[in-house]
C-alpha cells in the first residue's frame, strides 16, 4: 500500500517541478525555417508568433503561393520544436516520481 504522506510529498514535488517547467516554456523561443531560410518564424512557448522574416525575393506577386506555403512550413516547424521541448520538459519534471498504479497524467 502506498504511504499517503509520501504520495502527498511526491505530488507537491511534481507540482513544483511542473510549474518550473511551464515557466521555462513561457520564456522559450522557437524558430522555424523553410525554403533554405527564405522564411523564418519565431514563436513563444505559448505558440504565439513573435517574429516573421521573409526574404525580399519572395515579395513578388508570382511568388505568392510559394510564400504562403513557406510560411505554413516555417510555422509548423517552429510549433513542432515547441511541442517537443514542452513534452521533454514535462517528462523531466516527472522523472523520479513514483505514481500509484493506474494513475494517468492529463498530457
From Swiss-Prot:
Main location: cytoplasm
Record SUPFAM superfamilies: YbaB-like (SSF82607)
InterPro entries on file: YbaB-like_sf, YbaB/EbfC
GO CC terms, sorted: bacterial nucleoid; cytosol
Function: Binds to DNA and alters its conformation. May be involved in regulation of gene expression, nucleoid organization and DNA protection.
NCBIfam families cross-referenced by the UniProt entry: DNA_YbaB_EbfC (TIGR00103)
Subunit structure: Homodimer.
Descriptive protein name: Nucleoid-associated protein A1E_05550
Organism annotation: Rickettsia canadensis (strain McKiel)
